[in-house]
Swiss-Prot record:
Belongs to the pseudomonas-type ThrB family. The keyword ATP-binding applies. Its EC number is 2.7.1.39. GO terms for biological process: threonine biosynthetic process. This is Homoserine kinase. Pathway: Amino-acid biosynthesis; L-threonine biosynthesis; L-threonine from L-aspartate: step 4/5. The gene is thrB. It comes from Chelativorans sp. (strain BNC1). It catalyses: L-homoserine + ATP = O-phospho-L-homoserine + ADP + H(+).
Length: 322
């Protein structure tokens, strides 16, 4: 979450007249994240998250994102729900941008997740994959391999400013991933961004998943590989085998991986690391000065990518092989 667009109290009050949420009491911007402008609202009816969609979010994708939240909630997945307007729509407009009001989910994200947290995340991800199996809408992954290439074309010219030799290294990585990327593994709806700040806990128990604005249809094991990258590396970018084993075991307790998925896990983890390195690099070079947003270091994911290059089998991630 982040803030790119400032809004006035008058604008917000007028916007809220179209929702059954009472009167505005207070609001404040949320700085974490990189994609949309987000505000925490308190009204006489409760707490809500207001999201203004910008940057990489296409308005035509909003029915997928918001509909997915409704679908998952009906299937028992704990996640926020979009608030219906008085005209029964889900999408309004504020400050010239599409906007939606979302229910507030109780909990806190874990700054220092343990293996116990990772096990719960693995299970929750598998639950999400199964719950979304009959979701009728489709959305291709705009940040799959073709999307990585477009990002790279926008950042390559200045890449060596961030890390000497980065352009050559990433070009070599593209050559391998574009040649070997799997296309026939089990696929379905994936979250695609299940980082620690998108998972809430209460009293040590997972209380819900948030931020579905990268959700799409893609390889299920790629979603799991993204979680390995997001949850199982320490601050010094060393891989925590105990966390990895817990995350993978939690996932497989609900949805066992196929032999082919297990074999491809190192390559999928490389692709995931490249994807997040590229979006961080692009944002590092292009986010406007003065935006209330935290830039994230692309080199953290370059170091993950280098780790995955050395992995020969998925057993090195902590998965139990039959």
């Amino acid at each position: 979450m982040a803030v790119y667009t400032d809004i006035s109290e008058e604008e917000l009050t007028a916007f809220l007249r179209h929702y059954p949420v009472g009167k505005l009491l207070s609001y404040k911007g949320i700085a974490e994240g990189t994609e949309n402008s987000n505000y925490l609202l308190h009204t006489t009816a409760g707490a809500y998250i207001l999201t203004l969609y910008e940057r990489r979010v296409d308005r035509s994708d909003l029915p997928f994102f918001l509909g997915l939240m409704e679908h998952l909630a009906r299937k028992g997945v704990s996640c926020p729900l979009p608030v219906k307007r008085l005209d029964d729509g889900l999408i309004g407009e504020l400050a010239g941008r599409p906007a939606a009001l979302i229910t507030f989910l109780e909990g806190m994200w874990m700054r220092r997740p343990t293996a116990l947290h990772c096990g719960q995340v693995g299970k929750a991800l598998a639950d999400l994959h199964q719950a979304a199996e009959d979701f009728p809408l489709k959305r291709p992954n705009a940040l799959g391999p073709e999307g990585w290439r477009r990002l790279w074309e926008g950042a390559k010219a200045r890449a060596d400013e961030v890390e000497p030799g980065l352009a050559r290294e990433v070009d070599a990585e593209f050559a391998l991933l574009e040649r070997d990327w799997p296309k026939d593994l089990p696929s379905g709806v994936i979250h695609a961004d299940l980082f620690p700040d998108n998972v809430f806990f209460l009293g040590g128990e997972l209380s819900g998943l948030i931020d579905f604005y990268f959700a799409c249809n893609d390889l299920l094991a790629y979603d799991l590989a993204t979680c390995l990258n997001a949850w199982c590396f320490e601050k010094d970018i060393s891989y925590n085998l105990t966390k990895g084993a817990a995350l993978l075991a939690g996932y497989q307790a609900v949805r066992p991986l196929t032999r082919e998925e297990i074999e491809m896990l190192p390559l999928l983890a490389r692709g995931s690391a490249l994807r997040f390195m590229l979006t961080r690099l692009y944002d590092w070079l292009t986010i406007p000065d003065g935006a209330l947003v935290k830039k994230r270091d692309p080199l953290e994911y370059l170091r993950r990518l280098r780790f995955h290059r050395q992995v020969r089998t998925a057993s090195e991630y902590g998965i139990e092989l039959a």
